Amino acid sequence: MDLSDAYENAAYIPEATGYLERWPVQAAAFRESHGARARLDLRYGPDARNRYDLFLPDGAAAGLAVFVHGGYWHKFDKSFWSHLAAGPVARGWAVAMPSYTLAPEARISQITREVAAALAAAS
């Protein structure tokens, strides 16, 4: 089994490159349209990628949803996925989207500690 291949899902998704081109544009448009209810680049730790975005609904939040981005721990960051907060935010939920140090710079154990710290900061 080629482990590199096992982590490259895009090769198995028809027209995957289209998503990779559209999503950053959609994410940026969502951040811009959300205005003051988009709290961007909030720090949760000392490392460069220890930041999260928080998207708030109108009025009091029903709760907090946290979206930990994919990329098999070695690519992407929070800014790639912002538009995926639209549904929960429209239904009254706050949404936190953390970035974290990527592999191979960080091991999975460090990444999970960083995600836990982001959860604590956002809660």
For each of these PLM feature ranges, what is it?
Residues 62-71:
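Short beta-strand element of the alpha/beta-hydrolase
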Residues 46, 71-72:
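Gly/Ser/Thr-rich helix-start
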Residues 13, 72, 102:
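Short histidine/acidic/glycine/proline-rich micro-motifs that form metal-
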Residues 76-85, 96-123:
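Catalytic nucleophile-loop/oxyanion-hole region of alpha/beta-hydrolase
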Residues 3-60:
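N-terminal cap/lid segment of alpha/beta-hydrolase-fold proteins
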